[in-house]
Amino acid sequence: MIKDNLVKSAFNINYMYNANGILKDARSVAVTQDDIYINMTGNSGMATAGSGDVLTGIVAGLLAIGCNVENATTLAPYIHGIAGDLVATKMPKASIMATDIIEEIKNIMPQ
């Protein structure tokens, strides 16, 4: 199963499909053509409906402002996790919603 070994799964996805990717988990794994990154930001409160959609939106937003695919793949989980960590300082983790994560992104990203 993918979840049993995220790093190996990320490597296999890259090898089999020649693709960058993000495996979202408590410690998300991002894989590019050159490296595998383990994201250490984020918290258990982010395991909520829509959180993965927020992560996808961050990737798309980074691409839209000119980031290359590798940078977007590795930066998005970090930004997502930092936003979730900021939310967790303001409310109980069990109360976090995807919209709360979105609201914190403006405090991380420059205008």
Where are these regions (language model features)?
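A general alpha-helix detector
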Residues: 9, 57-58, 83
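Charged C-terminal helix
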Residues: 83-111
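Structural signal for hydrophobic packing residues in well-ordered secondary-structure cores
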Residues: 17, 21, 63, 77-84, ...
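Short pre-catalytic strand/loop immediately N-terminal to key active-site residues, enriched for Gly-Thr
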Residues: 38-50
